[in-house]
Amino acid sequence: MSGGDGIPTFKLVLVGDGGTGKTTFVKRHLTGEFEKKYVATLGVEVHPLVFHTNRGQIRFNVWDTAGQEKFGGLRDGYYIQGQCAIIMFDVTARVTYKNVPNWHRDLARVCENIPIVLCGNKVDVKDRKVKAKTITFHRKKNLQYYDISAKSNYNFEKPFLWLARKLLGDPNLEFVAMPALAPPEVQMDPAMIAEYEKDLDNAAKADLPDDDDDL
């Protein structure tokens, strides 16, 4: 699917509990923030996020709920024709991870078999509650997972690169230049990053629990 300018363009549905940092995350991409459009009928902001790859440009039209999820579920119109998705939770609030299966169920009901990335946001906050070893939902449902920190730009591009590779069917796709991002509001401690990356590696090798105690 191309935009009018020939750039491959995909609808990306961004979901997760209110307050997990979805809007903060999408606003990091400065041109997308500048060019966003408001869809009044659905009460949604659509941010066109363009990335430069070794195969040319790719655009994600990221649909952001503008906080409607605080009032219950989202209308089907939000999901319809979604081609990929990011489910976000807050690693400092366990309840937001507990609700991930509900968001996944809503997505899967309307958008069958689309590539989905699960993101644990706010890993810059020292008091992390949802640890790597308890994050197993993505392994059960064949999703990709990334720790992210919207406010520090940590791993900002990772979900988009993984989705771009899936959507374009090219596992060797690379981003050749980073988009202009808002300056970091916080700095990630390199030692903490190294520790979290090691924790995720170890968690990926661990056996999955038989039950759903992690949810």
UniProtKB/Swiss-Prot annotation:
Keywords: Cell cycle, Cell division, Centromere, Chromosome, GTP-binding, Kinetochore, Mitosis, Nucleotide-binding, Nucleus, Protein transport, Transport. Residues 67-83 are annotated as: Switch-II. GO terms for molecular function: GTP binding; GTPase activity. Transmembrane segments: none annotated. Disulfide bonds: none annotated. Residues 36-44 are annotated as: Switch-I. Pfam families: Ras. GTP binds at residues 17-24, 67, 121-124, 149-151. It is found in: Nucleus; Chromosome, Centromere, Kinetochore; Chromosome. CDD domains: Ran (cd00877). One of its GO terms (biological process) is embryo development ending in birth or egg hatching. The keyword RNA-binding does not apply. GO terms for cellular component: cytoplasm; kinetochore; nucleus. Ran GTPase system comprises ran-1, ran-2 and ran-3 and is essential in nucleocytoplasmic transport. Ran-1 is a GTP-binding protein that mediates the interaction between mitotic chromosomes and kinetochore microtubules. Plays a crucial role in nuclear envelope assembly at the end of each cell division. Required for the import of protein into the nucleus and also for RNA export. RCC1 (ran-3)/Ran (ran-1) complex (together with other proteins) acts as a component of a signal transmission pathway that detects unreplicated DNA. PANTHER family: GTP-BINDING NUCLEAR PROTEIN RAN, RAN GTPASE. Found in a nuclear export complex with RanGTP, exportin and pre-miRNA. Belongs to the small GTPase superfamily. Ran family. Loss of ran-1 results in failure of correct attachment of kinetochore microtubules to mitotic chromosomes and the resultant loss of correct chromosome segregation. The number and the location of centrosomes are normal, and astral microtubules also seem unaffected. Nuclear envelope is not reestablished at the end of each cell division. This is GTP-binding nuclear protein ran-1. It comes from Caenorhabditis elegans.
